[in-house]
A protein has these predicted regions:
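Flexible coil/loop and intrinsically disordered segments
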Residues: 1-206
Length: 206
């Protein structure tokens, strides 16, 4: 809300100076700080693992690159929504680690992803193509001159399964072969059959 005049701005400033308190909480580790914030944050947006990862990644960039990459990061987040962007990071972790998550997303992302790629590589080579692939897969919006309807029909059923285990391999494949619609159709068809079989037979692949 915008202030209409100087008196309103003055009253607001006086309120901040006399009625608001700044509380500083010190913790021994980033993990404990995250837990404390989650418990104490009764208002406002929840702090997601991606928020912490963002501060680490953007903070590691040279000063002259931070603004540009911040805008690129926020553009991707706007494309998916905060929760959707968090899912992209979960699937990216799975692509790198190739096994079930054993610790927190933030811990494993820092250990297995951030230590193997530079901040620029993470955003340009992984987050950008993986986010674009995620949006197409999640929304059944694969576009191509051939086979788009067939692919999107299969994606509709994949999204109906009771898990998202199919998403990481689909993201990686689509990100690496965005312009080969025939190959994408072949892969998604095989993936849908596998996912359906595992669902119907209640196979445990953990």
């Amino acid at each position: 809300e915008m202030f209409s005049n100087d008196d309103d701005r003055l009253r607001f400033t006086q309120f901040l100076l006399t009625r608001c308190y700044l509380v500083v909480v010190s913790t021994p580790s980033q993990e404990s700080a995250f837990r404390i914030f989650t418990v104490m944050n009764s208002r406002g947006l929840d702090l997601l693992p991606t928020d912490i990862i963002k501060s680490t990644v953007i903070g590691s960039l040279p000063k002259e690159k931070q603004q540009g990459y911040t805008e690129k990061w926020e553009g991707l987040e706007e494309l998916t929504g905060r929760d959707g962007f968090n899912e992209v990071f979960t699937h990216t972790r799975t692509i790198f680690v190739k096994e079930r998550q054993k610790k927190t997303l933030r811990e494993e992302f820092e250990e297995y992803v951030l230590k193997t790629v530079s901040p620029e590589q993470l955003i340009d080579d992984y987050l950008v193509p993986y986010t674009n692939a995620y949006v197409q897969l999640k929304n059944c919006e694969f576009t191509a001159t051939h086979h788009a309807d067939e692919v999107n029909g299969l994606l509709f059923w994949l999204n109906k399964t009771n898990n998202s285990d199919w998403m990481p391999p689909a993201i990686k494949f689509l990100a690496e072969h965005p312009n080969d619609s025939e190959y994408v159709l072949w892969f998604i068809r095989k993936l849908e059959r596998l996912a359906s079989y595992l669902l119907v037979t209640a196979q445990d692949v953990n």
